[in-house]
Amino acid sequence: MAAAAAAATTAACSSGSAGTDAAGASGLQQPPPQPQPQPAAAAPAQPPPEPPRKPRMDPRRRQAALSFLTNISLDGRLPPQDAEWGGGEEGGAAKPGAGGACGARTRFSLLAAAERGGCIALAAPGTPAAGLAAGSGPCLPQPSSLPPLIPGGHATVSGPGVARGFASPLGAGRASGEQWQPPRPAPLAACAQLQLLDGSGAAGQEELEEDDAFISVQVPAAAFLGSGTPGSGSGSRGRLNSFTQGILPIAFSRPTSQNYCSLEQPGQGGSTSAFEQLQRSRRRLISQRSSLETLEDIEENAPLRRCRTLSGSPRPKNFKKIHFIKNMRQHDTRNGRIVLISGRRSFCSIFSVLPYRDSTQVGDLKLDGGRQSTGAVSLKEIIGLEGVELGADGKTVSYTQFLLPTNAFGARRNTIDSTSSFSQFRNLSHRSLSIGRASGTQGSLDTGSDLGDFMDYDPNLLDDPQWPCGKHKRVLIFPSYMTTVIDYVKPSDLKKDMNETFKEKFPHIKLTLSKIRSLKREMRKLAQEDCGLEEPTVAMAFVYFEKLALKGKLNKQNRKLCAGACVLLAAKIGSDLKKHEVKHLIDKLEEKFRLNRRELIAFEFPVLVALEFALHLPEHEVMPHYRRLVQSS
């Protein structure tokens, strides 16, 4: 009789797998090994106790992330109505258990109420699951007050593992504690035709669990609407959030005038329809998927976006390689910058190693660099030095020609600091000076670069007592001695004669000798009397100033700026000044020389370049000035 009824209705009940269907069907004839609550026929008003839930053993990291991001939408966009979405692992079926009631409590328990409206075909003909379902007994639908199914309505299920999402009517009835009613025929149009793949079982379920998140299912809407009877309470306690997108298609998702009860709380009608809950769950899952994709995109592109935000341009494709070296001899350090750090990764210094150049090449570079005029510096901002290139307006200027050739990994080469080498270098410079006078043009002499670059500095040249004599002196030579007789001359005539003689001997110097000596007296008075600097510091300032004068860098416009910058540089190099002492010195220079503070500070670097960065002076250049300062004080 059970087989005939099943054949007449062409329906069977479904569970998570074929083994679950067999266990649920045989539960009508044989009691399960575990104690189950018996149907309460005598007292239908009192519901039986709810069987213990089987603990779920399939939580995944992705499901935890989806649950955490349930109500979070990072993109801020409303989900499209026809977008695909999946329930993840929530769409999985319940594992086959020992009892029929526990096996029938699947995660899609919402379909327990839908079984009252029609039977659902369990498997395709010829499969073992269909045979077990047909031989175990008829499908017994529950009486309900559902409206009739739509004529011709059917469900098409494609994809593996779809039947695991449906609940068995046998298990649902046993779980709800209701009396089984005689079977009634159901139309063929109200039954769903399921297409299952082979391989059901323990090995196939794990593969199906990964694929059931995105399954397209179309089922009549009336099959999923509960009647709201009290008897279907425990069997219908499912979660709408577990539905995938195919449970209620768009064709049946139009709002209707019927009032459906909520499956979360059966018995309360009309507050929230099942359609609204299903749509809300669908939008929530779409938001979860988009949130996960947005998070992955943010994590992948965070460094690029941060770089664009900080620099305002895309991140460069190729970065400069950084090498940590311990032995500098093993690495090519040319055209690179070396950062010296300690063993604890503390910054110490940064430097570059430049290739060695011959002295002849250095001289050529000096001549070429001396002929270039500094047109980038305006007269309003700063009065520049002639022949000094500062690299303004974005230009790059190299000062490698001012560096002394040294061995970077060994001892320093001999320089002109010693007495013997100084005499040799002086003879070489005199020969170069004579060559320069013979081959140089008048245009190059006007700049003063040739004479100034090749002429060695003599600290006694500008302070020679023979300069004031001029043509007014008379030299008397005797066998044992020589004497000079100077007639009385007006001071103005003597000064004029001295300047003319100095101009004839040094035509590239634009200042007169009397003006140079006057500036030196002002520098000494300001440094010693007003600021309290010592004689060695003043002697260094004299050397700086005379070098600039002999190179032809001084003129009428920048003479006081050069004098003030020389005193400031000498005070910084030769004295250990505090911050307030440097400020006091700048105030005095501004007051005595009537300078602008901003121009004075900005003029330090041009003077430094004109001095070829040679601020540490040898002893033979400073001592003559120091002796004269000590004698006159």
Curated annotation (Swiss-Prot):
Region: Interaction with CDK3, residue numbers: 179-492
Provide GO CC annotations from the record: cytosol; nucleus
Question: Which UniProt keywords are listed?
Answer: Cell cycle, Cell division, Cyclin, Cytoplasm, Nucleus, Phosphoprotein
**Any Pfam family hit:** Cyclin_N
> Keyword Ubl conjugation, does the record have it?
no
UniProt modified residues of type Phosphoserine: 168, 287, 313
Biased composition regions of type Basic and acidic residues, renumbered to the chain: 51-61
Q: Where in the cell is it found?
A: Nucleus; Cytoplasm
Briefly describe its induction: Up-regulated by progesterone and down-regulated by estrogen in benign endometrium.
- Residue ranges under compositional bias (Low complexity)? 1-29
Q: Does the keyword Cell cycle apply?
A: yes
Tissue expression: Expressed in breast, pancreas, colon, head and neck (at protein level). Strongly decreased in more than half of cases of atypical endometrial hyperplasia and in more than 90% of endometrial cancers.
| Residues bearing the modification Phosphothreonine | 415
State how it assembles: Found in a complex with p53/TP53. Found in a number of complexes with CDK2, CDK3, CDK5, ABL1, TDRD7, CDK17, CCNA1, CCNE1 and TP73. Interacts with CDK2, CDK3, CDK5, ABL1 and TDRD7.
Q: What is this protein called?
A: CDK5 and ABL1 enzyme substrate 1
Q: What is the lineage of its organism?
A: Eukaryota, Metazoa, Chordata, Craniata, Vertebrata
Query: What gene does this protein come from?
Result: CABLES1
